[in-house]
């Protein structure tokens, strides 16, 4: 089973990307959030992969820029009525920490923003994810009712972490330096500023 691919971005389509690994091209199905964060064609990337078998389609590779996203995808698919397409749709509108926060505050409306996810399915997702692992990230930082100040918007943090991982930096280290940069720069920090500050902290 394929768990990760490191290679060059050969093509990027509307629903998938072609990753060239030592001359072998892998078609990887991705959500729009992931596709928009991929490096330019010809540049190297690391894709975390989940293999899904379908009777009609055979094996399909689903790709994510972080282990956290792949873990959330796998967890979402344990819910009745949530297939790969719906799981990707949810992760397109809610990064794992945002999804965990929505579940914590029982915000089914946030989940229902996903394409193809109606109110009933959104309610089921919120209920069934209560006791399941979704994110390793600091969920409280993105909780609407958190008592601690929000250090950074999750979209900016996610983009910055993904960019650092694309440079070969391990996810835990990338998260640590991005969170540190966010605390210094404030909650309005944008991805480029976070990335620059994080790289400076790493001495690059």
Curated annotation (Swiss-Prot):
Region described as Domain III: 155-204
Region (Domain I): 1-65
Gene3D superfamilies reported in the protein's UniProt record: 5' to 3' exonuclease, C-terminal subdomain, DNA helicase RuvA subunit, C-terminal domain, Nucleic acid-binding proteins
Gene Ontology MF terms: ATP binding; four-way junction DNA binding; four-way junction helicase activity
Region (Flexible linker): 145-155
UniProt keyword list: Cytoplasm, DNA damage, DNA recombination, DNA repair, DNA-binding
Subcellular location, principal: cytoplasm
GO BP annotations, alphabetical order: DNA recombination; DNA repair
GO CC terms: cytoplasm; Holliday junction helicase complex; Holliday junction resolvase complex
InterPro entries: DNA_helicase_Holl-junc_RuvA_I, NA-bd_OB-fold, RuvA, RuvA_2-like, RuvA_C, RuvA_C_sf
Region spans: Domain II: 66-144
Family: Belongs to the RuvA family.
Domain-level remarks: Has three domains with a flexible linker between the domains II and III and assumes an 'L' shape. Domain III is highly mobile and contacts RuvB.
Subunit record text: Homotetramer. Forms an RuvA(8)-RuvB(12)-Holliday junction (HJ) complex. HJ DNA is sandwiched between 2 RuvA tetramers; dsDNA enters through RuvA and exits via RuvB. An RuvB hexamer assembles on each DNA strand where it exits the tetramer. Each RuvB hexamer is contacted by two RuvA subunits (via domain III) on 2 adjacent RuvB subunits; this complex drives branch migration. In the full resolvosome a probable DNA-RuvA(4)-RuvB(12)-RuvC(2) complex forms which resolves the HJ.
NCBIfam families: ruvA
Biological role stated in the UniProt entry: The RuvA-RuvB-RuvC complex processes Holliday junction (HJ) DNA during genetic recombination and DNA repair, while the RuvA-RuvB complex plays an important role in the rescue of blocked DNA replication forks via replication fork reversal (RFR). RuvA specifically binds to HJ cruciform DNA, conferring on it an open structure. The RuvB hexamer acts as an ATP-dependent pump, pulling dsDNA into and through the RuvAB complex. HJ branch migration allows RuvC to scan DNA until it finds its consensus sequence, where it cleaves and resolves the cruciform DNA.
UniProt-recorded name of the protein: Holliday junction branch migration complex subunit RuvA
Source organism: Phenylobacterium zucineum (strain HLK1)
């Amino acid at each position: 089973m394929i768990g990760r691919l490191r290679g060059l971005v050969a093509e990027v389509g509307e629903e998938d990307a072609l990753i060239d690994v030592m001359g072998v091209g892998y078609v990887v199905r991705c959500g729009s959030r992931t596709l928009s964060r991929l490096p330019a064609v010809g540049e190297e990337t690391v894709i975390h992969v989940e293999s899904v078998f379908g009777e009609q389609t055979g094996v399909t590779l689903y790709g994510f820029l972080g282990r956290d996203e792949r873990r959330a995808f796998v967890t979402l698919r344990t819910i009745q009525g949530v297939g790969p397409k719906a799981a990707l749709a949810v992760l397109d509108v809610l990064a794992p920490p945002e999804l965990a926060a929505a579940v914590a505050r029982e915000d089914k409306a946030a989940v229902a923003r996903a394409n193809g996810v109606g109110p009933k399915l959104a309610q089921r997702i919120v209920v069934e994810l209560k006791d399941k692992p979704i994110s390793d990230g600091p969920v409280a930082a993105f909780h609407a009712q958190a008592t601690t100040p929000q250090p950074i918007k999750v979209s900016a943090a996610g983009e910055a972490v993904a960019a650092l991982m694309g440079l070969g930096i391990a996810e835990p280290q990338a998260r640590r330096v991005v969170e540190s940069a966010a605390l210094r720069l404030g909650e309005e920090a944008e991805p480029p500023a976070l990335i620059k500050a994080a790289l400076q902290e790493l001495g690059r």
